[in-house]
């Protein structure tokens, strides 16, 4: 058990580093995006809408085939056809993206009119789609690197994409003043660089054989996953689409800043945990302790995520001031805690999904997420006209909570896993309590306020000891870890 957790932790660090490298672009460039010299607040709102459309495009036109490939690739029954399955998925993705790009290119003015009530973003639309198409093709082989546990190579390619994309973005936006279009031109160049780097693995892991029957099986498994993924993306993006239609692009710009900061929890921490854990969980399916491993991984993943949630929530104003010098953006700090706390339910939902993935109940997953997405849309329609930013953030938090509850009960009916719900509830209550306690320091001088907030974050793991969050053996291992590294530091 402990060796599996250590293996997952090691993978989390490496994949986390790779994920950080990719997502750092969105964080590093915030001071540029929020500087009126380069992008207006309306431009940043356009970027926010384009970002979520980019995510949706990848999900829809990728058909979740890379996820299906992962499920079939690890199955011993299909070991002899791994390369032909990989070839099949790559070819199908390339064909779909090529045909779809032609359609988007021809109808980009109409798509721009639909999104922004103007056709002036038509060029931006097809550049964005070209970038997402390259991402769809390369993501299949990037998934293969994960399945083959080539974490270092995965990280190297990801970091190279970061450097290329970051450098070209700065060149296009800061020096050539190409506005939002320059952002996606740079993204396209970065994706092409990543595809070139992974191309050797594409050829190495392919043989010229089209697996028609297996493709149908993967589509049968993957299409419900695509529905789930589309619904999930809509669930996470209806807030900005709704703000775009019910408010204005300036409001979308403020919300986008808050969401980008809060969403670092998902794209860096939660995604890294999932990238590392999922292959280990599927390999351990035959082990007698695999259910306990899943439950324990939930506990410690939740603790890690809650620590980051507290950091972003307690220091939201300071973080916003660092990234955005324009005072008009500072209101974003007030909704970061709501968006951040929604991430704990996203993380737990991803974990309980495992039961449905193991039993291949992808259709149920799609239905549940679709229902929650519609519920979220209804909440947005109800709350945004009256509460604007706060309504959108509250809608996100409530919807993620509802989705976790639905997935937990349905998943447990299909595949029972002994999750420690009491410990998870105590963790969430402790996190909320510490955040509320931090509010008393709102008018303190800067240094005492910062120190007090840091103390509250450090207190969280210790507060869980009397609440019996840890088992005795876990406390013993923690003590041994502290003693070991204390000796190394003071040697």
Question: Each predicted region: which residue ranges?
Answer:
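Interfacial segments at transmembrane-helix termini and the short loops linking adjacent helices
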Residues: 108-128, 312-344
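Membrane-interface junctions at transmembrane-helix termini in multi-pass inner-membrane proteins
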Residues: 134-157, 202, 206, 337-371
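N-terminal membrane topogenesis motif
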Residues: 1-28, 80-88, 212-228, 472-491
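Signature of the first transmembrane helix
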Residues: 4-67, 92-105, 162-166, 170, ...
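Membrane-proximal transmembrane or re-entrant/amphipathic helices at the cytosolic face
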Residues: 440-491
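Helix-loop junctions and terminal segments of transmembrane helices
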Residues: 61-78, 147, 258, 262-302, ...
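Interhelical loop/hinge segments that connect adjacent transmembrane helices in multipass membrane
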Residues: 1-8, 180-182, 186, 196-236, ...
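Hydrophobic alpha-helical transmembrane segments
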Residues: 122, 126, 155-203, 221, ...
């Amino acid at each position: 058990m402990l060796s599996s957790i250590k293996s997952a932790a090691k993978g989390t660090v490496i994949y986390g580093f790779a994920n950080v490298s990719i997502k750092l672009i969105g964080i590093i460039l915030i001071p540029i995006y929020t500087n009126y010299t380069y992008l207006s607040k309306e431009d940043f709102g356009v970027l926010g809408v384009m970002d979520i459309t980019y995510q949706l495009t990848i999900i829809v036109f990728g058909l979740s085939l890379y996820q299906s490939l992962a499920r079939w690739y690890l199955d011993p029954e299909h070991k002899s056809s791994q390369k032909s399955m990989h070839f099949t998925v790559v070819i199908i993705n390339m064909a779909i993206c090529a045909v779809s790009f032609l359609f988007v290119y021809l109808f980009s003015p109409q798509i721009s009119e639909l999104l922004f009530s103007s056709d002036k973003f038509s060029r931006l639309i097809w550049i964005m789609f070209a970038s997402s198409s390259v991402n769809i093709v390369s993501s299949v082989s990037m998934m293969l690197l994960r399945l083959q546990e080539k974490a270092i190579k995965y990280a190297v390619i990801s970091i190279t994409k970061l450097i290329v994309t970051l450098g070209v973005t700065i060149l296009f936006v800061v020096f050539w003043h190409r506005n939002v279009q320059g952002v996606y031109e740079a993204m396209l160049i970065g994706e092409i660089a990543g595809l070139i780097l992974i191309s050797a693995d594409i050829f190495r892991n392919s043989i010229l054989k089209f697996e028609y029957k297996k493709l149908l099986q993967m589509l049968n498994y993957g299409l419900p996953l695509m529905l789930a993924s589309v619904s999930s993306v809509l669930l996470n993006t209806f807030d900005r689409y709704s703000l775009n239609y019910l408010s204005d692009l300036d409001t979308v710009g403020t919300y986008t800043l808050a969401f980008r900061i809060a969403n670092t929890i998902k794209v860096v921490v939660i995604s890294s945990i999932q990238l590392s854990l999922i292959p280990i969980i599927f390999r351990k399916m035959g082990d007698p302790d695999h259910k306990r491993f899943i439950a324990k991984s939930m506990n410690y993943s939740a603790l890690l995520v809650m620590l980051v949630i507290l950091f972003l929530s307690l220091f939201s104003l300071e973080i916003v001031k660092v990234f955005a010098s324009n005072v008009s953006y500072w209101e974003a700090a007030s909704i970061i805690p709501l968006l951040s706390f929604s991430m704990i339910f996203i993380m737990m939902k991803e974990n309980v999904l495992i039961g449905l993935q193991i039993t291949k109940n992808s259709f149920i997953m799609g239905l549940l997420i679709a229902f929650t997405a519609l519920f979220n849309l209804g909440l947005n329609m109800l709350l945004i006209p009256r509460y604007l930013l706060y309504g959108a953030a509250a809608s996100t938090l409530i919807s993620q909570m509802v989705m976790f509850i639905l997935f937990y009960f349905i998943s447990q009916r299909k595949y029972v896993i002994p999750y420690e719900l009491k410990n998870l509830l105590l963790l969430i209550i402790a996190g909320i309590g510490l955040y509320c306690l931090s509010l008393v320091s709102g008018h303190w001088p800067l240094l005492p306020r910062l120190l007090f907030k840091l103390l509250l974050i450090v207190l969280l793991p210790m507060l869980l000891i009397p609440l019996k969050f840890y088992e005795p053996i876990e406390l013993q291992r923690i003590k041994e870890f502290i003693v070991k590294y204390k000796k190394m530091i003071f040697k």
